[in-house]
């Protein structure tokens, strides 16, 4: 599918974004192995989170969609830690790295063997990073060419480990913790830098014996999780596209409602403010241990900056759209320590650079980042998203500041995380 995006003079209005993808995955998995029903409000409408539900359904977990007080609900009928049953066929995680990596932690402890694979993008993404700690816990996992899906996971009795993550990764941390729920003894995960802690908060909310320290998580095995009512905040990573859209058009006054403001995720706001963005936080509340609030963004003068060190993994998903902002900022943008971008849905360093160049933007790539001079102007172009949802959406935002209409190839990739993206963009762009 190809989407035409026209230039815009302004971004105005009040809008919402889909339920947070990271939180949705975790709630679906944990509710499935909890005792009794969990009612989840605002579960993500994205294809990735649907993949998680499909996998859990294949493992014997029913879910029911509904509505309450005008809000979408999803009820997951949990069966407890021992309630999963062997799938009749290989599980399909679609495009979702979160699904395959985190669910593998649960599957490693089951009394049966499970195959799990994904689409043509996912089968190119490395899995050794989860296989190593799971093997230390006594799991046996076979991978294609030693590192890639499809995976064959032979369930086993697991033992707790003390594991230091070699690279900051919330997915790997979560995989080990989910396995740790079933393990004998204590499981400890140590991080080089703080990563998103949605798994830890959800585990605590559902009754796990978990201790959270700076960069260290301790989990006692054998916990009995209890189903409950859960609210998924709006996805800040999805909001990022509209925050940047407001910053690259001439006039802006935009409010994004009910956005997740978990401190492990708000580095994006710190980066934008550091570049000069005028962002206000409104009506902050707490739901299931997660902070939620409204964001207001208005016309701002954007200076530019550098993303490096511990900040990089904290904004790794937002770098495509931050690169777009960097090109029109006064001083440009430098991104370092972002080699993880090369093993996302595409090699995002190269895909970002390719499409910036298509729009006549000067950019230099490095092994672990990008160097983008500022004060540049976007030219109308045909954008190649390569089927990567964040590339499609980031360059749709760039198109708002172009000198003519842009065509976004494979624009339907946006449905992986934000099915309503283009309709929402049309509603707020003027």
Features from the language model and the residues they span:
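Structural preference for solvent-exposed beta-strand-turn elements
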Residues: 1-430
């Amino acid at each position: 599918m190809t989407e035409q995006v026209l230039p815009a003079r302004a971004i105005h209005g009040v809008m919402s974004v889909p339920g947070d993808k990271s939180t949705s995955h975790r709630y679906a998995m944990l509710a499935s192995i909890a005792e009794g029903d969990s009612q989840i409000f605002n579960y993500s409408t994205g294809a990735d989170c649907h993949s998680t539900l499909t996998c859990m359904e294949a493992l014997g977990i029913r879910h029911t969609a509904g509505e309450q007080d005008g809000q979408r609900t999803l009820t997951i009928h949990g069966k407890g830690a021992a309630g999963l049953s062997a799938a009749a066929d290989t599980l399909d995680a679609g495009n979702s790295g979160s699904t395959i990596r985190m669910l593998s932690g649960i599957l490693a402890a089951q009394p049966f063997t499970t195959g799990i694979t994904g689409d043509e993008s996912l089968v190119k993404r490395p899995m050794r990073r989860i296989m190593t700690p799971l093997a230390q816990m006594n799991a046996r996992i076979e991978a294609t060419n030693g590192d890639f899906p499809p995976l064959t996971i032979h369930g086993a009795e697991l033992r707790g480990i003390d594991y230091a993550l070699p690279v900051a990764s919330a997915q790997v941390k979560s995989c080990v913790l989910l396995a740790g729920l079933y393990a004998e003894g204590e499981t400890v995960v140590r991080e080089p830098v703080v990563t998103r802690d949605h798994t830890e908060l959800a585990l605590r909310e559902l009754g796990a014996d978990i201790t959270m320290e700076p960069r260290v998580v301790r989990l006692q095995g054998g916990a009995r999780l209890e189903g409950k009512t859960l609210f998924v905040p709006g996805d800040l990573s999805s909001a990022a596209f509209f925050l940047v859209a407001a910053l690259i058009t001439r006039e802006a006054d935009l409010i994004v409602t009910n956005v997740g403001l978990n401190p492990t995720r708000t580095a994006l706001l710190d980066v934008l403010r550091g570049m000069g963005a005028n962002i206000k936080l409104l009506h902050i509340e707490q739901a299931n241990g997660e902070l939620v609030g409204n964001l207001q963004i208005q016309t701002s003068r954007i200076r530019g900056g550098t993303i490096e060190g511990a900040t990089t993994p904290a904004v790794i998903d937002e770098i495509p759209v931050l690169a777009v902002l960097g090109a029109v900022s006064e001083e440009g943008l430098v991104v370092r320590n972002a080699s993880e971008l090369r093993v996302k849905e595409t090699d995002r360093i190269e895909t970002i650079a390719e499409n910036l160049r298509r729009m006549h933007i000067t950019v230099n790539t490095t092994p672990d980042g990008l160097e983008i001079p500022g004060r540049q102007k976007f030219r109308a172009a045909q954008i190649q998203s390569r089927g990567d949802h964040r590339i499609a959406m980031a360059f749709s935002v760039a198109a708002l500041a172009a000198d003519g209409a842009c065509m976004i190839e494979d624009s339907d990739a946006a449905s992986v995380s934000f099915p309503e993206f283009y309709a929402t963009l049309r509603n707020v762009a003027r």
